[in-house]
From Swiss-Prot:
PANTHER family: SH3 DOMAIN-BINDING PROTEIN 4, SH3 DOMAIN-CONTAINING PROTEIN. GO terms for molecular function: GDP-dissociation inhibitor activity. Keywords: Coated pit, Cytoplasmic vesicle, Endocytosis, Membrane, Nucleus, Repeat, SH3 domain. InterPro entries: DEATH_SH3BP4, SH3-like_dom_sf, SH3_domain, SH3BP4_C, SH3BP4_SH3, UPA_SH3BP4, ZU5_dom. Residues 312-449 form the ZU5 domain. GO terms for cellular component: clathrin-coated pit; clathrin-coated vesicle; cytoplasm; nucleus. Homodimer or homooligomer. GO terms for biological process: cellular response to amino acid stimulus; endocytosis; negative regulation of cell growth; negative regulation of cell population proliferation; negative regulation of GTPase activity; negative regulation of TOR signaling; positive regulation of autophagy; protein localization to lysosome. This is SH3 domain-binding protein 4. The SH3 domain mediates localization to the clathrin-coated pits and vesicles.
Length: 957
């Protein structure tokens, strides 16, 4: 905004400084003083000049500044300056009674308004205690005063200037009132800069900010303004939500047609008769702006969180005792020593990771290996330096030439675009760097680079280093029938949790970007800047990824410059009725088609379905009517079927042709005598290794035990049960008990189990009954009353975990009790998902350091790909602890299982086969994977026998 307002036609005809602001026509104002403004000159701006403009603001320098070009103004600490224009954000236009020029805003602070030496500078003579007080004094609320809360607003002790602007219309809204005659001597000027606000707050301001400029004391006329005087909404803030930006765009002179937000219009207060109607409409609009699933159709399917952070940042205030400030979700931190500032003072540190580095830092001789860090300090009166600690994403080549030609350096600058100068006090151990920052400035930019010495073209610094880049997959909070995922490549390991994406469709340049969430990421070594092909695959045929198989290209020069590349992949669900979460596989190929990296990511779940509320009038029961309610005996309070313990009638029978007695006992391989009869659950065969070679096996029931029998040793005779069949009859209860024998030997992650159950179990009462907690009240599981059903399910699960881990009672297996309960309420889909997760995790733990051998047997994974799985889990020295070897093994197994498909039977069968192929296979000592294979192949038999295929007729009311 401008520091002065003059007519669009300058009567003097003199050139104007561009920073003095846009010309605003005040032809409707009768006061002659506003039309006779002269162009600024040094002589006209002296303190003793009575013709000084009313909107000149006095500031004091807090630090010396020596300019490096003729457009900036030199000043010393303690010198008084007079600001003419604050629209430049980080640079203000000011004068010092002798000359004019630009000054950095961080080097000055507004002078206390009560001690201002400008008698007519427009400073507030008596700062009001609250916004409401000023509103009442100026009669700005009109007829809405009774609707606004009388609670006092928090006093603005830090900012001497009140700054009303557009805001949430809920509390108080945008206001540009009509100004009546003010008392002589009372001048009100609400400045539009805040000395404590960050610099980006200024650059994002719009021309619709509310400004109550100083009018002459003798003004008796009203100023016409575009906003109605009786607008009830008023609040002071510096940021805008998507709703407010839509209002500002709609009110602009040249509205953008066909823009990104063309279909997302916020309701205007003038369209409604009462405040309550507008409040309801505004709430409905805000509800729509929460979860975007199609970036091209935001107007039809809106909803991204407009309050998400733009970049990874943190602000922390420390006292003289010191401490540390760590950037969230990164390995970047600043250590503040004790007595860094004097006792009683504080230091506010702002730390931000910038995604795109300056162009000068990436070329043939230099490349960035960390994000550019913006460090802002509030207190320059310090007694000790700061220490910056971060991790770099590069390793020097192993040969001696690489160590001599390339060095890791830390560069620092006072401006984002440079110039950058090296920092001498730097300590490197492994991939961790510590930098000692002295000569502190209010704003500093620090970055780590790999810089070559004596490198001659066509050689580059990339030939002497192993630089790691990160590929991250981003998407909306919930998946929808049509949404877009974004693959982003970063030149370092700091992939932010949220990413701004605006290269979508043919949107306007001024449209706000969309914030997506990080679904998953992986780091890999990029040998050189080259064209990369990024592909995205879905593991479900129901979802189609446009251009996913062919992939999209990232050019080598983009990687060389270190810029963040964002590739957008539209994803469409072929059958929206079957919408569910699924797995996406990310693959990165080099310029010759080789796979550099690939990993799998599980998408979020669809948004929860909300039931349609009845639109008819609600009738509440009277107190005396409650006791008269008689529930129908046909009413069903639980949607889950009842597990019935009854004989399994679908068995087939066979005659054993051979006697088998095993020397090495296996609880899942049967021993039997020739001539006996055995029951077979089905004629489907399982493949696994016997004593010497692979064989085919039936799942049989013999003498009260469930296990495997070699198919060649059985002659199938039919479904008729022979009279001489010995042993107890197979019932669903006995079958369930036999199936679940391997469960207690499987490893699980409780947090993952808890999340799955909370998402998939709809009734805590049915779940508790299945676990054996029949007729126990909710208070038995939780101390406080829980409102949501998911929290109640979680409390029941927590109770089960406590009882299984307690030593006093009979020892129970948490896994076995949980799977048994889920099978009793017919949650087979949830069971197989849990079983598969248990099996993959247990296999990873059992295989541990031998996972590379398993990877070769299952998928023929290259050594480079194996290194990629281990890279994220290595320590600072590049070593991978033996106890952590299960982590890359688990990552690989998740990726591999996603490639197999949706068949849980195939996943466990192929995993068993791969383990059997290993040298000294672990399945010889760890036999419970065989039992798990029996379990998943018996589920259908159990379900068919235990649950009726038809619902009872009285289940429908």
């Amino acid at each position: 905004m401008a520091a002065q307002k003059i007519r669009s036609a300058n009567t003097n005809g003199l050139p104007r400084c561009k920073s003095e602001g846009a010309l605003i026509d005040f032809s409707g104002v009768p006061d002659p003083n506003l039309s006779d403004v002269k162009v600024l000159s040094p002589s006209s701006l002296r303190v003793d000049n009575p013709a000084s403009l009313d909107n000149v603001k006095e500031v004091v320098a807090i630090k010396d500044y020596c300019p490096n070009n003729f457009t900036t103004l030199k000043f010393s600490k303690g010198e008084h300056l007079y600001v003419l224009d604050t629209s430049g954000g980080e640079w203000w236009y000011a004068h010092n009674t002798t000359e004019m020029g630009y000054i950095p805003s961080s080097y000055v602070q507004p002078l206390n308004y009560r001690d201002s030496c400008l008698s007519d500078s427009g400073m507030i003579d008596g700062l009001l205690e609250s916004v409401d007080e000023g509103v009442k004094e100026l009669d700005l609320l009109g007829d809405w005063t009774e609707t606004i809360s009388q609670d006092p607003i928090k006093k603005c002790h830090n900012n001497p200037f009140l700054r009303p602007s557009v805001s949430n219309p809920f509390l108080n809204g945008p206001l540009m009132p009509q100004i009546h005659a003010l008392e002589t001597g009372n001048s009100v000027d609400l400045l539009l800069f805040d000395p404590l606000a960050p610099s980006h707050a200024f650059s994002s301001e719009t021309s619709t900010d509310v400004l109550l400029d100083l009018l002459p004391n003798n003004t008796q006329n009203e100023v016409a303004v575009p906003v109605k005087r009786d607008n009830p909404f008023f609040r002071s803030k510096r940021s805008y939500s998507l709703s407010e930006l839509s209002v500002l765009q709609a009110k602009s002179e040249n509205p953008t047609t066909g823009s990104f937000f063309a279909g997302l219009k916020s309701p205007a207060p003038e369209q409604f008769q009462s405040r309550e109607d507008f409040r309801t409409a505004w709430l409905n609009h805000r509800k729509l702006a929460r979860s975007c699933h199609d970036l091209d159709l935001l107007g039809q399917n809106p909803g991204w969180g407009q309050t998400q952070p733009v970049e990874t940042s943190i602000v922390c205030r420390l006292d003289s005792s010191g401490g540390a400030v760590q950037l969230p979700d990164t390995n970047i931190s600043i250590h503040v020593p004790e007595k860094h500032v004097a006792s009683g003072e504080t230091q506010q540190i702002s730390l931000k990771a910038l995604l795109d580095p300056p162009l000068e830092l990436n070329n043939d001789k230099c490349t960035t290996v960390s994000p550019v860090l913006e460090i802002k300090l509030s207190n320059m009166d310090v007694q000790s330096p700061l220490t910056l600690e971060l991790r770099i994403s590069v390793a020097l080549g192993g040969n001696a030439s690489a160590l001599n030609m390339v060095g890791i350096k830390c560069l620092r600058s006072d401006a984002k675009e440079g110039p950058y100068n090296p920092v001498t006090q730097i300590y490197i151990y492994g991939d961790t760097v510590q930098v000692k920052l002295d000569n502190l400035e209010p704003v500093m930019y620090v970055v780590m680079v790999a810089q070559g010495q004596g490198i001659v073209s066509p050689s580059s610094v990339w030939e002497y280093i192993n630089k790691k880049v990160t590929v991250g997959l981003y998407g909306p909070k919930h998946i929808h029938p049509s949404f877009k995922a974004v693959l982003a490549i970063f030149g370092h390991d700091c992939a932010p949790k949220t990413l701004l994406v605006n290269e979508v469709g043919q949107q306007a340049n001024n449209s706000a970007p969309v914030t997506l969430q990080l679904w998953g990421k992986q780091q890999f070594v990029l040998p050189k800047p080259q064209d990369l092909q990024l592909c995205l695959f879905s593991n479900m045929t129901n979802y189609r990824v446009d251009a996913g198989d062919q992939g999209k290209m990232v050019r080598g020069f983009q990687l060389k410059l270190g810029k963040v590349s964002r590739l957008i992949f539209p994803i469409i669900c072929q059958e929206p009725a079957q919408l569910s979460d699924f797995t996406l596989r990310v693959q990165v190929r080099d310029e010759v088609g080789g796979v550099l990296s690939q990993y799998c990511v599980q998408t979020p779940r669809p948004p929860p379905k909300t039931g349609n509320k009845s639109t008819g009038p609600r009738r509440f029961l009277k107190k005396k009517e409650v006791g008269k309610i008689v529930l129908s005996p046909l009413a069903v309070t639980c949607k889950y079927p009842t597990f019935q313990d009854r004989p399994v009638t679908s068995l087939k029978y066979g005659k054993l042709l051979k006697t088998v007695v095993r020397q090495s006992k296996n609880p899942y391989l049967l021993e039997y005598k020739k001539g006996d009869v055995i029951g077979l659950l089905s004629e489907e065969k399982i493949r696994l290794k016997g004593q010497l070679w692979n064989k085919e096996w039936y799942i049989g029931y013999y003498q009260g035990k469930l296990g495997l029998v070699h198919a060649k040793n059985v002659l199938v005779v039919g479904k008729v049960k022979p009279s001489f069949f010995s042993g107890p009859e197979l019932t669903t209860g006995l079958l369930l008990e036999q199936m679940l024998r391997p469960c207690k030997f499987l490893t699980y992650i409780y947090a993952s189990v808890r999340t799955l159950l909370m998402e998939n179990i709809g009734s805590w009462r049915c779940f508790a009954d299945a676990l054996g907690y029949g007729n126990l009240p909710l208070s038995y599981f939780c101390r406080v009353e829980l409102e949501s059903e998911t929290e109640r399910v979680a409390s029941v699960l927590e109770k089960l975990k406590e009882e299984c881990n307690s030593e006093g009672k009979e020892k129970k297996s948490f896994q076995k009790e949980l799977i048994m309960a889920l099978l009793k309420i017919d949650c087979q889909g949830l069971v197989v998902r849990l079983i598969q997760d248990f099996v993959l995790l247990t296999t990873a733990v059992e295989v541990a350091s031998r996972w590379r051998e398993l990877a070769e047997k299952l998928a023929r994974v290259s050594k480079q790909q194996m290194d990629g799985y281990e890279a994220p889990h290595r320590d600072r020295n590049g070593a991978l602890d033996s106890e952590a070897m299960w982590k890359p093994a688990y990552d690989f197994l998740l990726t591999w299982s996603a490639q197999i498909g949706e068949s849980y039977r195939d996943v466990i069968q192929e995993l068993h086969t791969g383990l059997d192929k290993m040298r000294s296979p672990i399945t010889k000592r760890w036999k419970h994977l065989t039992g798990t294979l029996i379990l998943v192949n018996s589920l259908d038999i159990l379900r068919a026998a235990a649950f009726s295929t038809q619902e009872p007729e009285d289940c429908i009311i």
